[in-house]
Amino acid sequence: MDSSRILRYEGRLDFGSLRARRIRAESEIPAVVYGKESDVLHIKIKSSEFNNKFAKFTDNTVLILSDGKIEKCVFIKDVSENLTKRLIYHVDFYEVDKTKDIERDIAIKFVGASVGVKEGGTLSVLRTKIKVKSLPLNLPEFVEVDLTPVKKGDQVTFKDIVLPDNVKLSEENENSVVLLVK
């Protein structure tokens, strides 16, 4: 596991807005971890560590929360922030079982310049996300679609998108059009 995805945490037993303010005053962020098969866990994380890594995270970044003994596989569910003060007030993490497949919508990243567009065609993007299924640690943050070979009159469907080996398409209709060039 990439060390940039590991966040250290400490458990906390005290709650409420007064205690949350004290935690933030100590350069930490109050947070909560919950999931379908786990109890709610109240934690605090170092503000500097989270802020340094937060800019690189997406909705599909799998993080490992660790207290030195227990590791939890999580996604960021919600971040409460004060934009004027540039402070993160609270983070909600959603825990998943790293041994079970999950379904997620991941971004489609379009790269290259389409031959059809160079010939005067118009590129119409109809979908920017794709539903996939995989183990959490195998989940890509996005998939790339190379537009270079797409000619005028061509279309790209979900089944045309190349996914990593351990990732499966989970769309109901694999023939749905993602983009086309007219």
From Swiss-Prot:
- Answer whether the UniProt record assigns the keyword Hydrolase to this protein: no
Quick check: keyword Ligase in the entry? no
Species of origin reads Borrelia hermsii (strain HS1 / DAH)
Q: Name one GO cellular component term.
A: cytosolic large ribosomal subunit
Family assignment from sequence similarity: Belongs to the bacterial ribosomal protein bL25 family. CTC subfamily.
| Organism lineage string | Bacteria, Pseudomonadati, Spirochaetota, Spirochaetia, Spirochaetales
Oligomeric form and interacting partners: Part of the 50S ribosomal subunit; part of the 5S rRNA/L5/L18/L25 subcomplex. Contacts the 5S rRNA. Binds to the 5S rRNA independently of L5 and L18.
Q: What protein name is recorded for this chain?
A: Large ribosomal subunit protein bL25
Per UniProt, the keywords (alphabetical) are: Ribonucleoprotein, Ribosomal protein, RNA-binding, rRNA-binding
GO MF term (any one)? 5S rRNA binding
Which SUPFAM superfamilies does UniProt cross-reference here? Answer: Ribosomal protein L25-like
Task: Give the function comment from the record.
Answer: This is one of the proteins that binds to the 5S RNA in the ribosome where it forms part of the central protuberance.
Any one Gene Ontology biological process term?
A: translation
**Database matches in InterPro entries:** Rbsml_bL25/Gln-tRNA_synth_N, Ribosomal_bL25/Gln-tRNA_synth, Ribosomal_bL25_b-dom, Ribosomal_bL25_C, Ribosomal_bL25_long, Ribosomal_L25_dom, Ribosomal_uL5_bac-type
